[in-house]
Amino acid sequence: MVEFLNSKNPQDIIDKLSLINNNGNKNIGNGNKTNNKKYITYSKNVFIPICNWCKNICGYCTFRRENYKLMNKQEIKEILLTGNKHGCREALFTFGETVDENPKIKEDLKKMGYNNILEYLYDISDWCLTNTDLLPHTNCGILSYEELKTLKEVNASMGLMLENSSDRLYNTIAHKDSPGKEPKKRLKMIEDAGKLKIPFTTGILVGIGETNEEIVQSLVDINNIHKKYGHIQEVIIQNFRAKESIPMSNYEEPTPLKMLKVLIVAKLILKDISIQVPPNLNSETGQLFLFAGVDDWGGVSPITKDFVNPEAPWPKIEELKKYTEEFGYSLKERLPVYEKYINENWLSCKVLEKIK
């Protein structure tokens, strides 16, 4: 049996694990009792893939391109200004991990006047804060403590998917060619963000060959870090989607029942952390996941697509509102930083001034 790190009551965790196994079916429907809110939140955003090259070659990813595109400033500014006109409040900035290791990209950046991608990102984020009502949220792979510290100045929140904390899984088709997916590196960054008091989003990926024990262990690992620093505002429970162009195209997607069970366990373990499922990856079943205590839909864009899952269009906000209300909740727009973190203890003066 897996060791549940720092758990005060391992048997309690083992009991939660049983909810994912077959004898947990009777618990379906109990998860929504843990959601005391009368609303489900979402963030109206723009998705800006600054560069789609990546050092990692994950078995389930379609984002990475060898024939990469590095967006120029004008392209990015146009999207930000369009988002501003449509009332978006979040600018999701993303690019592949350690893109600076690609000499062609480094050369392109130098031609633009930047030594590295983080200088470019900082400049773009600063422009965004100064010229629009959007708040930057960056998710760009592994960053050092100092890099996080610098980006905190111009970001309302940041994120990194843990995906799974299993060393075994790291050596499978999912991550064997992805040095940045080594669990200890990702856990360290999540912890560094806590030390720096950065409001943070993380999550797990379900259906990439993990065991039920590894799912629970990953959630426990996230919770243990959060208990130390209190900075994790939401955890995404993301279901694997099979695509023809990926090495894992023959992998089965997790069933709705499996997702329900994982979501219930996540809510029981993570308690005060919001649980998010991407509505565009669960267009037929997302409404059912509210039974499991899901309380956030995440970022939804009226003007940009999901560049990580381009085959899955965002629902229209009116549609999201309709099936949220059908369940008995109201739909509430939020910022990329949760309300409890909007103070000088968590945000830079520049970001806080923009919000207030």
Swiss-Prot record:
For whether the record's keyword set contains Iron-sulfur, the answer is yes
Report the EC number(s), separated by commas if there are several: 4.3.1.32
Kindly list the GO molecular function terms attached to this UniProt entry. Answer: 4 iron, 4 sulfur cluster binding; 7,8-didemethyl-8-hydroxy-5-deazariboflavin synthase activity; iron ion binding; transferase activity, transferring alkyl or aryl (other than methyl) groups
Q: Which cysteines are joined by disulfide bonds?
A: none
Enumerate the Pfam families for this protein. Radical_SAM (PF04055)
CDD domains the record matches = Radical_SAM
Q: Where is the Radical SAM core domain?
A: 40-280
Give cofactor(s), names only: [4Fe-4S] cluster
Q: Where does [4Fe-4S] cluster bind?
A: 54, 58, 61
The reactions it catalyses are:
5-amino-5-(4-hydroxybenzyl)-6-(D-ribitylimino)-5,6-dihydrouracil + S-adenosyl-L-methionine = 7,8-didemethyl-8-hydroxy-5-deazariboflavin + 5'-deoxyadenosine + L-methionine + NH4(+) + H(+)
What's the record's note on cofactor binding?
Binds 1 [4Fe-4S] cluster. The cluster is coordinated with 3 cysteines and an exchangeable S-adenosyl-L-methionine.
Q: Does the keyword Acyltransferase apply?
A: no
Keywords, in A-Z order: 4Fe-4S, Iron, Iron-sulfur, Lyase, Metal-binding, S-adenosyl-L-methionine
At the top level of its lineage, which domain of life is listed? Answer: Archaea
- What SUPFAM superfamilies does the annotation carry? Radical SAM enzymes (SSF102114)
- Tell me the pathway: Cofactor biosynthesis; coenzyme F0 biosynthesis
In the record, the note on similarity to other proteins reads: Belongs to the radical SAM superfamily. CofG family.
Its job: Catalyzes the radical-mediated synthesis of 7,8-didemethyl-8-hydroxy-5-deazariboflavin from 5-amino-5-(4-hydroxybenzyl)-6-(D-ribitylimino)-5,6-dihydrouracil.
What is annotated about its quaternary structure and interactions? Consists of two subunits, CofG and CofH.
Q: Please give the name of this protein.
A: 7,8-didemethyl-8-hydroxy-5-deazariboflavin synthase
Q: Which organism is it from?
A: Methanococcus aeolicus (strain ATCC BAA-1280 / DSM 17508 / OCM 812 / Nankai-3)
